[in-house]
Amino acid sequence: MTNPLVTIAIPSYNHAKYIGETIQSALDQTFQDFEILIVDDSSTDNTLEIIKKFTDSRIRLIVSEKNQGVCQTSNICIQNAQEKYIALIASDDIMEKTKLEKQINFLEQNSNYGAVFSGMEVIDENGVTNKKKTKKYTKIFEKENRSRFEWLKYFFHHGNCIAAPSLLAKTSALKETGNFNKIITQAHDLDLWIRLCLQGYEIHIIHEKLLKYRERNNNENLSSNTKDTRIRLLFDNEKVLKNFLKISSLNDFIKIFPDSSGASLQFFSKEEEKIIIDYLIFKEAYKNSPNHYHTQFAVSLLYETLQKDGAEEILNKNFGFDFNEYKKIITQNPLGVLLEKCNEPFSKKILKSFLKI
């Protein structure tokens, strides 16, 4: 008996009301060569009772002894997936019947692609379509397809535009790229897409709504638009940009940022090349991106780059950059500006004490 072609992986937690519908949508796929792997994150409701009502032999259940969060539960899914492909779906979402068929057909015909996504229809807690939010999410998540280098440029400047719940990927690609980073609480999906593209895999969006994404009341979704979520997302997005520091050649940098000023394929030593790449990444973040987290990332990167032996001389020789320019740049550090504004009386007091010395 041959192994199935795809693992439908369902990280599950306290979704007793919805998990049955999610499992049934998997069982109803037009493509039937699959196993269903459910990893329950120590649910405290009757989710497990609902799961165990399904007697299909293709269902495999792993129950965590303690609650670990969606990232780690998804990682357990990936680690335990044994088939060629893996489809990750939340335990309150619904797969359209042709989802697996269409996504697997694409990957089977395009061997250089590591993952394929789709659009999604937004439904409420009762399964009713929210047309307004579906239209909004269509604009966000059904972007024009492009090469992995072009995706990387988009991710760098604009952040995520991929519907994570629609993922179907090569299992080997996810295992090679590494797990979801559980320390990245809001942008762990973007973090993985960037690493996947940097690893050399192309990604693709099928512009059909192959998933029903459930938006819960009372901000119960991980991605709900709350103040806390927005703060965490800004923090995460700055950290996610650090993935771009893995770019090790000017050739790759130019493929991602072909319009970058000052980038040229002349000969440098390995040490010089890395300093120049990091400086060019600083420039991309500092001058060409609109968000404060880009500026915070850029200023921190410039500081780290200038710690390297000979960095100031290399940057001065190739870009005319000097220490006076660095001093001007760090005064625009968003965190510093914010702290100075919040603590203006204290800052003035400290400054006066220094001036007396």
Predicted regions and their residues:
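N-proximal low-complexity "stem/linker" segments adjacent to membrane-targeting elements
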Residues: 1-27
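Short loop->beta transition adjacent to catalytic acidic/histidine clusters or analogous donor-positioning motifs
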Residues: 3-6, 27-38, 46, 57-60
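Glycine-rich, basic loop-to-helix element that forms the pyrophosphate-binding segment
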Residues: 22, 64-81, 94, 102
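A conserved acidic beta->alpha catalytic loop
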Residues: 25, 40-49, 66, 90
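Conserved nucleotide-sugar donor-binding catalytic segment
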Residues: 79, 96, 118, 141-263
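Short aromatic/hydrophobic "clamp" motif used to bind/position activated sugar donors
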Residues: 86
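Conserved donor NDP-sugar-binding/catalytic core segment of glycosyltransferases
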Residues: 98-133
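C-terminal subregions of glycosyltransferases and related glycan-biosynthesis enzymes
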Residues: 156, 198, 214-357
